[in-house]
Amino acid sequence: MNKRSWFIPILIVAINVLAIMMRWCSLSELLPAHYDLEGNGGGTMPRSVLLLYPLIGAAVCLVAYVIARMKQKLQTGLVILASGICLVLLSSAMVTLTAGTMPVFMLAEPVILLAAVAGFVACVVKSRKKKKAVISH
């Protein structure tokens, strides 16, 4: 299995950690829990919740890596899916770090997730077609 392909999702998680750490000291203890498209915050959450975003991203990468070790034909699809999920988590962190002033991050999340799922499905379909072609010969 090509371990270098996991560089991209791990890099995304690292960027997420770096972005949070760069802003950590300037963040108040309580942050808005969500924003609307005009940047108005609502609800509150402790800033420590931000640490969950890269941890969840790393967990997603780890689970995808373990599954890919078992099903090597799905490796590319799992890397795409893990990268997409990590990008969505990074986008969520960036919405909070920019105090909701950059709604492009919120708008990008469904597009990123849809593209990641589509990429994963395409890889699954492709691997099944190869499997059927091998069986029929």
Model-based region annotation:
Residues 8-19, 78:
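Alpha-helical transmembrane segments of integral membrane proteins, especially early/N-terminal helices
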Residues 1, 129-137:
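Short, charged juxtamembrane terminal tails flanking transmembrane helices
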Residues 21-51:
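Active-site and channel-lining beta-strand-loop segments
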Residues 1-11, 45:
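N-terminal membrane topogenic signal
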